Amino acid sequence: MSQFDRIHLVVLDSVGIGAAPDANDFVNAGVPDGASDTLGHISKTVGLAVPNMAKIGLGNIPRPQALKTVPAEENPSGYATKLQEVSLGKDTMTGHWEIMGLNITEPFDTFWNGFPEDIITKIEDFSGRKVIREANKPYSGTAVIDDFGPRQMETGELIIYTSADPVLQIAAHEDIIPLEELYRICEYARSITMERPALLGRIIARPYVGEPGNFTRTANRHDYAVSPFEDTVLNKLDQAGIDTYAVGKINDIFNGSGINHDMGHNKSNSHGIDTLIKTMGLSEFEKGFSFTNLVDFDALYGHRRDPHGYRDCLHEFDERLPEIISAMRDKDLLLITADHGNDPTYAGTDHTREYIPLLAYSPSFTGNGLIPVGHFADISATVADNFGVDTAMIGESFLQDLV
């Protein structure tokens, strides 16, 4: 019999809690990540008030220096620790795949200076359309169509851009480049980015409509992803007939592998929390696992190096945490974590190699305290242990510590 009927894992995308031991092996604009500290620097520079996460034990997590404005609790309501990444990468897919039990020894490729000319020319030759070179770099998806949509409407050129993650995105006005054509181009782009030196996690079709100054992305987005190279704990649960619910971009990250209920993309963190609470309230969700990603911390504030916005986003999540807790059933377990860091005070605009926090809460807890410092995959090992399925490649369960 499972210790918990349901486990809800919430990833606060990029909310790291201090440089990992190997952080200096990773760089931002030529600066090693060794001094990065997402939560620590936000707390120190702009202040951070997250009383609900603090109550569970966020301020109790061991650090060289305590979080300046997040006090430790004498009697926390749950358990806390920090986890280290093993895999050779600091991107979203690597972090999530490791959380679900895989060790990624060959990281995906990211393109901070845009895609190489040979990829661009291959897409041009295949599609018969030119590519707007000025857009070929990491770009906000809304800003890139604001900046280059008018030109695309005049010339029919493709808008190809990337982000901090290993993705190639193609934006196309639906009245200029029909959806079927866009999808066909994306399928081709997928076929030429399956191995080094351009091993990408996803190709994303980003259709939009409207007029200059009033463009809107449509629901016709399509992701061309790769599935994990081995079974994750999601697959183990699915194979055992256990419900797995994905909220936000989780389904995309795993290419649907091991997920039997996709609850859709999030329009915002708040929308994602609404969807999570709705999922938790489903009468048919009696036993199983929900997996939620809240991406605004990373996409809107981390990459843009906006500590004030990042802080406010954390405050907004913390204010809604009691709603999530209220939706829990007596034998539910809530796990709150991250997938990498993205220190908004740091050099560059890339993710940062950090420990991730882990907070655990259940209405059934009779104890509290610290869990030993472990690794990302310990989360999936704990989920597997609880539901009686095999673990994936790596991970050690801490289920026995949750009493």
Swiss-Prot record:
GO terms for cellular component: cytosol. CDD domains: PPM (cd16009). It is found in: Cytoplasm. Binds 2 manganese ions. Its cofactor is Mn(2+). It comes from the Bacteria. Its main location: cytoplasm. Mn(2+) 2 binds at D298, H303, H351. It is an enzyme of class 5 (isomerase). GO terms for molecular function: magnesium ion binding; manganese ion binding; phosphopentomutase activity. Pathway: Carbohydrate degradation; 2-deoxy-D-ribose 1-phosphate degradation; D-glyceraldehyde 3-phosphate and acetaldehyde from 2-deoxy-alpha-D-ribose 1-phosphate: step 1/2. Keywords: Cytoplasm, Isomerase, Manganese, Metal-binding. It catalyses: 2-deoxy-alpha-D-ribose 1-phosphate = 2-deoxy-D-ribose 5-phosphate; alpha-D-ribose 1-phosphate = D-ribose 5-phosphate. Mn(2+) 1 binds at D13, D339, H340. PANTHER family: PHOSPHOPENTOMUTASE. Isomerase that catalyzes the conversion of deoxy-ribose 1-phosphate (dRib-1-P) and ribose 1-phosphate (Rib-1-P) to deoxy-ribose 5-phosphate (dRib-5-P) and ribose 5-phosphate (Rib-5-P), respectively. Belongs to the phosphopentomutase family. This is Phosphopentomutase.
